[in-house]
């Protein structure tokens, strides 16, 4: 796993530093270089041409009066290009930052100029402020290593296939509803035969093309169901036998009652399997569960959670919190929630479950990092060897 991102203010070494900001697009990358003396050089290279980018870096060092061994500090905004460029730059000795684009400050005018060049100049200005020690000018993205990013695709593929499966079922139900038909079971090996036997309200057979549409939709549903079953089996095998860091942590999480193998795998691959956290606030911030206070003059209120982090994890945490109340009723967390919110209304309970989710997240972190089982929680029996 790669080391943590360089801290603000740690990149200026003896004045021999080349700063580089990248504006990435589908066809062309715009590159802006700057030296500590304030000199600048702007160039363009073909997208994904790392060799050409390295040549421009060498040329910029010469033109800006820096030595060939000068350190290079670069940045680009996180987006569709992912993290491969970050790994390529670091493999060539460049200190790179991947920046959360939503954290970059923008003018609040009704209309503002927006061009790639203006964005590039803005990015360079923020980079220079960051290296001077202004850590809060933006948020730096934590980049997973290649293995952690790869194993994360498994849980995301399963989620994507679940969505496709649901859409096919909904489409079939909608087509049948237009004919006044409702079925308890959709799909199956005999789906084509069952479609041919369906009858409208007056006993007549379905139209030829409607039957064809239903059969084709059923075939697509069967393909997705098969792929989904195969990926789930692979996930369960990894959780049971895998030696990767994410698999080991998923296995430990699955020992807790109320957390199934599916949830534990998502927790491990998205959060605990590759990231490290210094404190509870940093942990809660990673999934958008930190508070957002508002205080101006005499007005002061809480605006709710920030929702600035991983949405998948935040959604799953709330689901797990409800499961925790059901399957871990004697735990300290469940008793805390029941004592305060059991007799409140529906809206208050929905708000309160987020508080439980935040406490549960911290408890799971302590369990994985320090082996501290949540107070009163029950563990599942280990399978016999």
Question: Regions from the language model: what does each represent?
Answer:
Residues 50-73:
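Short, basic/hydrophobic alpha-helical segments
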